[in-house]
Design a protein with these regions (language model features):
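Alpha-helical adaptor scaffolds
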Residues: 49, 56-66, 72-93, 101
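Inter-repeat linker/turn residues at the boundaries of leucine-rich repeats
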Residues: 14, 38-41, 65-68, 92-95, ...
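Short, solvent-exposed loop/turn at the beta-strand->alpha-helix junction
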Residues: 2-4, 24-32, 52-59, 79-86, ...
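Short, contiguous, helix-prone interaction/anchoring segments in small proteins
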Residues: 31, 36, 40, 49, ...
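N-terminal segments that cap or nucleate solenoid repeat domains
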Residues: 1-43
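Ankyrin-repeat and related helical/solenoid repeat scaffolds used for protein-protein interactions
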Residues: 86-145
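Conserved hydrophobic beta-strand positions in leucine-rich repeat
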Residues: 17-21, 43-48, 70-75, 97-102, ...
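C-terminal capping region of solenoid repeat domains
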Residues: 6, 16, 125-126, 133-194
Length: 194
């Protein structure tokens, strides 16, 4: 991996508002270095997919005053869990976020609820949070938040995946519950050999 300062020089746009470090495998160490870089104070868009960043790295970024102007944070395909998402949801430096992509991380219900209940993320309009570990409670919290906030574009896994049909007793007629039932059915059908 090249040094983070070298990557910043290579990929920071001339106006210093966009930085795309996709697939650079910077990890937490690189994320911490980003959080202290003086070259990123004007940054509006930070793109960090597939960089092996965990909660430690995203906490450094979310808590860095360097990112107070950030409107777009793309951190899909990392290893960020609920703890990292909670830091984003509470950090005063993330208050200008309009777009957050957490696609393909390790976020569960707790992280989704933290985003849904966040007072800090009041400007968030686009949330991409599919392919995580969020279940019904988290999805429902986000959908309720969408109704009462500016969150216009919510991309979550389909709720149909979490609804299960209840099996009734009538559906149990053909179920076999013991070896004795197997033998009895085999005898009835003439399939049992002596």
């Amino acid at each position: 991996m090249a040094s983070v300062e070298y990557l910043i020089k290579q990929f920071l746009t001339p106006d210093k508002k966009n930085l795309d470090l996709s697939n650079q495998n910077i990890g937490d160490k690189g994320a911490v270095q980003l959080s202290t870089s003086k070259n990123l104070r004007k940054l509006k868009k930070l793109i960090l997919p597939n960089n092996n960043i965990s909660d430690e790295g995203i906490a450094a970024i979310a808590n860095s005053e360097n990112f107070k102007n950030l409107t777009d944070l793309d951190i899909y395909g990392n290893v960020i869990s609920d703890d990292g998402v909670k830091v984003i949801a509470k950090s005063p430096h993330m208050k200008n976020l309009k777009k957050l992509s957490l696609y393909g991380n390790l976020v569960e219900d707790e992280g989704a609820i933290a985003i849904a209940e966040s007072q800090t993320l009041s400007k968030l309009k686009h949330l991409f949070i599919t392919s995580n570990r969020i279940r019904r409670e988290g999805i429902e919290s986000l959908q309720k938040a969408k109704c009462r906030t500016r969150l216009c574009h919510l991309h979550v896994d389909d709720m149909k995946d979490f609804y299960y049909e209840e099996v009734t007793d009538e559906d149990d007629e053909d179920l076999i519950n013991s070896w004795e039932e197997i033998k009895a059915r085999a005898e009835k059908d003439g399939d049992l050999e002596d």
